[in-house]
Amino acid sequence: MFDANCLKLMFVAGSQDFYHIKGGKNDRINALLDALELALQSKITAFQFRQKGDLALQDPIEIKQLALECQKLCQKYGAPFIVNDEVQLALELKADGVHVGQEDMAIEEVMALCKKRLFIGLSVNTLEQALKVRHLDGVAYFGVGPIFPTQSKKDKQVVGVELLKKIKDSGIKKPLIAIGGITAHNASKLREYGGIAVISAITQAKDKALAVGKLLKNA
């Protein structure tokens, strides 16, 4: 079951987001699991598993194994576990949700595959994209961004807080979650529009518990 409260502070990450950690692949995997547990203890409201980028795992078996370990941690702390893009993996793991982008499978196809077994989040980068699927009950929420400049989506044009405002003003009732360059310093600007999703605000933080606390306070 989808509860919009889980969008308050979503941590999005994969092992590639720990590129600053010395060592190899296993060190990055361990760093992700450690950071996730700390973030869960500090009360993030959901976790999205995202393997993308130069240092992302490539072997499907390794990806599934890591996803499973992340899912177990989420279950331990009672937080929803969401898989980014990989619909088949999300179904195999019986994840709580799956998040897809505009470049992925057609949203109608995702809905047909999921058969309401897990909730679906959809990334939108324009008002038109949001309006086009506003009527689809199978889409639980919209991910909107990048709101601010970000390292993890260098190729994407920044849409700014303006897009959140446009979507809200258009009468769209679906819950929104903002992503892209969000920090404890700018999170409060987004509070009236919905939840926030962060990567580096947690992965790069020296004190992850403190970072989560500040984000929650401002979200």
Swiss-Prot record:
Associated pathway: Cofactor biosynthesis; thiamine diphosphate biosynthesis; thiamine phosphate from 4-amino-2-methyl-5-diphosphomethylpyrimidine and 4-methyl-5-(2-phosphoethyl)-thiazole: step 1/1
Organism of origin: Helicobacter pylori (strain Shi470)
Membrane-spanning parts: none
Residues annotated as signal peptide: none
InterPro entries from the UniProt entry: Aldolase_TIM, ThiamineP_synth_sf, ThiamineP_synth_TenI, TMP_synthase
Gene: thiE
Family assignment from sequence similarity: Belongs to the thiamine-phosphate synthase family.
Highest taxon listed in the record's lineage: Bacteria
One BP term from GO: thiamine diphosphate biosynthetic process
Cofactor list: Mg(2+)
Disulphide bonds in the chain: none
UniProt keyword annotation of Nucleotide-binding present: no
Cellular-component GO terms for this entry: cytoplasm
GO MF entry, a single one: magnesium ion binding
Annotated function: Condenses 4-methyl-5-(beta-hydroxyethyl)thiazole monophosphate (THZ-P) and 2-methyl-4-amino-5-hydroxymethyl pyrimidine pyrophosphate (HMP-PP) to form thiamine monophosphate (TMP).
EC number: 2.5.1.3
Protein known as: Thiamine-phosphate synthase
UniProt cofactor note: Binds 1 Mg(2+) ion per subunit.
Binding, Mg(2+): D85, D104
Keywords: Magnesium, Metal-binding, Thiamine biosynthesis, Transferase
Catalyzed reactions per annotation: 2-[(2R,5Z)-2-carboxy-4-methylthiazol-5(2H)-ylidene]ethyl phosphate + 4-amino-2-methyl-5-(diphosphooxymethyl)pyrimidine + 2 H(+) = thiamine phosphate + CO2 + diphosphate; 2-(2-carboxy-4-methylthiazol-5-yl)ethyl phosphate + 4-amino-2-methyl-5-(diphosphooxymethyl)pyrimidine + 2 H(+) = thiamine phosphate + CO2 + diphosphate; 4-methyl-5-(2-phosphooxyethyl)-thiazole + 4-amino-2-methyl-5-(diphosphooxymethyl)pyrimidine + H(+) = thiamine phosphate + diphosphate
Presence of keyword Transferase: yes
